[in-house]
Amino acid sequence: MAIDAATVRKVARLARIAEPEEKLEPLAKELSGILNWIEQLNEVDTDGVEPMTTSVETTLPMRDDVVTEGGDPAKVLANAPKAAKNFFVVPKVVE
């Protein structure tokens, strides 16, 4: 799959990445190479291969689930940029 400079420009704009015009063509070639490699991977027969999340099978250590009184609010909020009434104060993100 070939990617041209116009596609790179569009993707960069959608991703809010500022790329100078002189870098668009080299990026297009690089992305085309990556997609060609992915197309090669798609040709590999993976029938019968179990999905895996890691290359090494491990078991995570378990710990007792113990209820505590929680931390000291003063210590927890000591590094907070802003706190009020024992809560973190954060900017509003939902309008």
UniProtKB/Swiss-Prot annotation:
It catalyses: L-glutamyl-tRNA(Gln) + L-glutamine + ATP + H2O = L-glutaminyl-tRNA(Gln) + L-glutamate + ADP + phosphate + H(+); L-aspartyl-tRNA(Asn) + L-glutamine + ATP + H2O = L-asparaginyl-tRNA(Asn) + L-glutamate + ADP + phosphate + 2 H(+). Keywords: ATP-binding, Ligase, Nucleotide-binding, Protein biosynthesis. SUPFAM superfamilies: Glu-tRNAGln amidotransferase C subunit. One of its GO terms (molecular function) is glutaminyl-tRNA synthase (glutamine-hydrolyzing) activity. GO terms for biological process: glutaminyl-tRNAGln biosynthesis via transamidation; regulation of translational fidelity; translation. InterPro entries: Asp/Glu-ADT_sf_sub_c, GatC. It comes from the Bacteria. Its EC number is 6.3.5.-. The keyword Protein biosynthesis applies. Heterotrimer of A, B and C subunits. Belongs to the GatC family. NCBIfam families: gatC. Allows the formation of correctly charged Asn-tRNA(Asn) or Gln-tRNA(Gln) through the transamidation of misacylated Asp-tRNA(Asn) or Glu-tRNA(Gln) in organisms which lack either or both of asparaginyl-tRNA or glutaminyl-tRNA synthetases. The reaction takes place in the presence of glutamine and ATP through an activated phospho-Asp-tRNA(Asn) or phospho-Glu-tRNA(Gln). This is Aspartyl/glutamyl-tRNA(Asn/Gln) amidotransferase subunit C. It comes from Phenylobacterium zucineum (strain HLK1). The lineage of its organism: Bacteria, Pseudomonadati, Pseudomonadota, Alphaproteobacteria, Caulobacterales. The gene is gatC.
